[in-house]
């Protein structure tokens, strides 16, 4: 009888250890897969020497979204842009942390095309850089509603053209590539450009807001960019 009990106990322990080991292995595999899948989704262009500046912008957006939602109103857009102006500017250009962005400015930029162009024209950059940036942002605005992959491919193609340019100076290339990198990461976090799987997963939730988050993302970028140059 004692032998039977001993065998039963040993068998139970063996099964328990095996199950625990399999569970731990499964957990480790799942974690690795999730980490790999997440990292592969982060946009990056290794050929852009200023790509890290866009990643800094994404890191700030991620921090902001921990306690706030994606803007769905002029006031929320204003708050997010002010946060980015203060923190991105503070990290890079201490002399410009007093830059402000008002709800009135946000409303004008959301409603009309000319203020967007005027904002670029007011940047302290060369006419050549302004020309490239105006065309760049107009192209992005025209692609509202596109999935992120298409936006990303457009930006990478644009950056390739800038890098190969024989007419732009090095500092002009730096300015343009910094702006394009920030735009890459800003649009990545915009829920409007999530893939079809994401759309299906939220199909039973409330209808998406009419607030143009694509345009709002570009406006935040422009407001920050204006303080950098």
Residue ranges and their predicted role:
Residues 19-199:
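Acidic/polar, low-complexity intrinsically disordered N-terminal segments immediately downstream
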Residues 9-10, 137, 222:
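Enrichment for repetitive, rod-forming helical segments
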Residues 13-16:
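C-terminal motif of bacterial Sec signal peptides marking the signal peptidase cleavage site
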Residues 4-8, 215:
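Alpha-helical transmembrane segments
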Residues 190-229:
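Hydrophobic, gly/ala-rich membrane-insertion helices/peptides used by toxins and envelope proteins
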Residues 1-5, 18-19:
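Positively charged n-region of N-terminal signal peptides that target proteins for export
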